[in-house]
Regions:
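Beta-rich, blade/repeat-based domains predominating
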Residues: 1-2, 7-9, 19-25, 34-54, ...
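Short loop/turn segments immediately following the C-termini of beta-strands
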Residues: 6-8, 60, 70, 107, ...
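Short, solvent-exposed loop/turn segments at conserved positions within beta-propeller repeat blades
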Residues: 9-23, 60-63, 107-108, 180
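A short loop-to-beta-strand structural motif that recurs across blades of beta-propeller domains
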Residues: 23-26, 64-66, 111-113, 183-185
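Flexible "stalk/tail and boundary" regions
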Residues: 26-30, 113-125, 129-132, 139, ...
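Beta-propeller fold detector
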Residues: 35-38, 76-84, 122-131, 135-136, ...
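Short loop/turn segments immediately following beta-strands, especially the blade-tip
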Residues: 68-75, 115-122, 187-198
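Blade-level signature of beta-propeller repeat domains, shared across WD40, Kelch, NHL, RCC1
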Residues: 158-206
Length: 206
């Protein structure tokens, strides 16, 4: 089992800067818990790739989608940056589709993007961003003054999308969890999702 810890800073907003580098990934197994990767830019959601070869993780304030090769004992190899995000874009949640592409939710910019792990190409699939809001948050981020109040107001219906999960017949829809919304949103998807590994646990147990 792998878990992410976003920051060692107190308050956590002290790491809401381009210099964020205190996040880490913890590996938990029969030998206990230990740090498997360190020095990351505000580690957020992580997932094992469908082929089981890599652990993918969003570095929210590092503004990167990164991955680590997985060894058989669960340890992680050297980090590889798959995609970097631009002004006003902060990656949060992620999920894989049936074609091995990575879907990433972007807070502040209120976007849903699809990343090709082979080329690093980022395709914008859903965009509700407010350019004025994005510019204001970007300025505070660069100045090292970004605070909770800056992120507390919704500027679109997506309202800071922080997670997604494929659902429905053929996995052709997705639920979006949004930090500032009072509901979970369901959107149609152009491609089927990849079933998460835990869906097969009961089958494996039998």
């Amino acid at each position: 089992l792998w878990a992410t810890v976003s920051t060692r800073q107190r308050p956590r907003s002290a790491d809401w800067t381009p210099r964020a580098n205190t996040g880490f990934i913890v590996l938990m197994d029969g030998r206990g818990a230990r740090i498997a990767a360190d020095g990351l830019g505000y580690t957020n959601e992580c997932h094992v790739s469908p082929d089981g070869r890599h652990l993918y993780v969003n570095e929210t304030y590092g503004r990167r989608l990164s991955r680590f090769p997985l060894a058989e004992d669960g340890t992680l190899g050297a980090k590889e940056v798959i995609a970097e995000f631009g002004s006003g874009e902060f990656p949060d949640g992620l999920a894989f589709d049936a074609e091995g592409q990575v879907w990433v939710t972007i807070i502040v910019a209120d976007r849903l993007v699809r990343v090709d792990p082979r080329s690093g190409r980022v395709a914008r699939m859903l965009d509700a961003g407010d350019p004025t809001h994005m510019a204001r948050i970007e300025a505070a981020f660069q100045a090292g003054t970004l605070a909770s109040d800056d992120l507390a107001q919704a500027h679109s219906a997506l309202a800071n999308p922080s997670s997604l999960a494929f659902t429905g017949p053929g996995e052709r829809a997705a639920w979006l969890g949004c930090l500032l919304a009072d509901r979970i949103m369901r959107v149609p998807m152009p491609v089927a999702g990849h079933p998460p590994p835990h869906w097969a646990w009961q089958e494996q147990a039998q």
